[in-house]
Amino acid sequence: MKNRLKLILLVGIATSFAPIAYSQTGSIEQRLQAMESQIAQLKAELAAEKAKGESDVIQLEQKIATPSAVTVSNQSSKSGFQVGDTTFKLGGFVDFDTHVSEFSDGGFAGGSVVRDFYIPGATPVGNGDNSTTTTDLTAESTRFSVTGSRNVGGKTATAYIETDFLLSGQGNERVSSSFAPRLRRAYIDYNGLRVGQEWSTFQNTSAIPESASFYTLGDGQVFVRQAQVRYTTGNFQFALENGNATITPAAGSGRIEADSNTVPDVVARYNYKGDFGNLSLAAIGRQLRFDTATTPSESDFGWGLSAAGRIGVGEGDLRFSLTGGEGLGRYIGLNSINAGAVNPLTGDVEAIPSYGGHVSLRYPLTEKSRFNIGVSALFADNPDFLPLTATENTQSVFAAYLFDIAPKVTVGFEGLLGERELENGTDGSLTRFTFSTKYGF
């Protein structure tokens, strides 16, 4: 309408000037030519205006279709969401557990981690007249993780952070149970290199049994997370990991967390995967150094080997590990055995030999339910100068039934029996029943 009005006005102006042109030229042909020229000019202007309008519409549509670099995509999918050129993924689960625990030789105060999951070396011994039963309800094993990845130099760089709420020094069960997050894993991956805090390269995490509780059969398993630098090439992995030896002092009891290493722990591992499952063979070398302000530094060499894996058995799988060496300490059995001990006669640090293993079977009963059963053990070859109150072995068995009541929602029931025995034959046991409800996301 606006363009038509413009045309009418221009034609009117041109017509009003026509008598003047006629008086000047007196020629009808000249007047017609002038009018035709004006009309042609108006058509050209209208065409230009139309083209410009279409161009503006196209640019506007493109601007709407293409978000800015800082716009967060609101399209949810399994591949995560994007912020700029970085893709983020959120993961984890909400876990509610009920534990009913009976300690044959004395219990633990509320808030102790021993009441949250099985720690083999902490089972009380030597007080058979003091059996204690406790019931605990907790959601502290709830877990949350964030993954961020982007293209850097034609390769994918990934950062990962994972937390839960176990072992929290904050909070209590009196009023609000305000447990603080703790760091589990935090690392960066790029071009075969992983740096940060991660599961030890000495450990095959696929061998961990499925359970209703946070962790089970800890006696003979390698179970360590720590800061490290790891390089993976093909089936081989090599790592330098944080070194920290636990030492039994000359007095013969207790534990010194020496943390006096001058070199990191060195780990090498070979992985093999196939249709059958996976197998791994790992070796570790470590320095057991003890140095204080009042004693000269002493050290010994620790080493270990570990074979572990997961193998398919029918519709289920068999998970296992076998580990042994000298000075393994905290790497096996959740540090039930120290890495070394100070000889009270010489003052030297001597590595303590230890060995253990576990095996568990996971077998599906239906599409939504499965049964797990397993056994684990750890043994120490303590030096003669250690007292007879030193831990000689720990053992445990468990069985668990898990059922998926809805997508990503699992309920589980578990029974566990754990025992610890000292060099003098004194022992104690833990019997625990666990009910859990878990929702993964």
Features from the language model and the residues they span:
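Gram-negative bacterial Sec-dependent N-terminal signal peptides
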Residues: 2-22
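N-terminal periplasmic/intermembrane-space "pro-region" immediately following the signal or transit peptide
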Residues: 22-109
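Outer membrane beta-barrel
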Residues: 76-116, 120-247, 260-273, 278, ...
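Outer-membrane beta-barrel proteins
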Residues: 80, 129-134, 176, 217-219, ...
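Sequence/structural signature of outer-membrane beta-barrel proteins
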Residues: 101, 151, 166-171, 200-204, ...
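Membrane-spanning beta-strands of outer-membrane beta-barrel proteins
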Residues: 139, 181, 224, 262-265, ...
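Detector for outer-membrane/organellar transmembrane beta-barrel domains
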Residues: 274-391, 395
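Outer-membrane beta-barrel "beta-signal"
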Residues: 403-405, 428-441
